[in-house]
Amino acid sequence: MAKNKFSKDWIHQHINDPYVKLAQQKGYRARAAFKLLEILDAEKLMRRGDIVVDLGSAPGSWSQVARERLAGPGGAVDGRIIALDLLPMEPVAGVEFIQGDFREEAVLEQLARMVEGQPVDLVISDMAPNLSGVGVADSARIQHVCELALEFACAHLKPNGALIVKAFHGSGFSQIVQSYKQRFKRVVERKPKASRDKSSETFLVARDLK
């Protein structure tokens, strides 16, 4: 009964969520688009000519935002957008997509080859591991995903590049922040308005490699 009540509550909340309705109106595939938009506006990030890598891209709302931000006068992408996800993603015009597991070395190598010789301006990561409900195990998974995004960004970003990554408050969060501060000159936390109040998610914005 409790599970059914939870499901009904979630459905009710989802249907009445203003960001869900706004996403439908604007053609975004998910309400998460508004999280990224708020962060980009606050940080004045992503502009024409940028090379952007979108990690954990499915269903594609962040890639859609990048596509809009990088659109030139004729509508074509002015820059480059490379997206990656374990799940399939419906094509977004002008976005190059890799389907694969970011934790696998072969997939990382494929992504690295695609950006070889082209330093990246911005890495955006909405990746989240499958959570088990076991605190210690989940914290380790979250930390691992954040560390993978960090290592990729440090290897491929321009010196003045930036990384936006989803994390979760809880055990291990302070270690994630500390590891980011060791590699970047500026690291801030942002909780966009589109993030649900009950969610422990937060976004780290790391800028300027040390």
Swiss-Prot record:
It holds the Pfam family FtsJ. It comes from the Bacteria. The active site is at 166 (proton acceptor). It is found in: Cytoplasm. Keywords: Cytoplasm, Methyltransferase, rRNA processing, S-adenosyl-L-methionine, Transferase. Residues 191-210 are annotated as: Disordered. The keyword Heme does not apply. One of its GO terms (molecular function) is rRNA (uridine-2'-O-)-methyltransferase activity. S-adenosyl-L-methionine binds at residues 60, 62, 85, 101, 126. Its EC number is 2.1.1.166. GO terms for cellular component: cytoplasm. It is an enzyme of class 2 (transferase). It catalyses: uridine(2552) in 23S rRNA + S-adenosyl-L-methionine = 2'-O-methyluridine(2552) in 23S rRNA + S-adenosyl-L-homocysteine + H(+). Residues 191-200 have a biased composition (Basic and acidic residues). The keyword Cell membrane does not apply. Specifically methylates the uridine in position 2552 of 23S rRNA at the 2'-O position of the ribose in the fully assembled 50S ribosomal subunit. PANTHER family: RIBOSOMAL RNA METHYLTRANSFERASE, RRNA METHYLTRANSFERASE 2, MITOCHONDRIAL. Belongs to the class I-like SAM-binding methyltransferase superfamily. RNA methyltransferase RlmE family. This is Ribosomal RNA large subunit methyltransferase E.
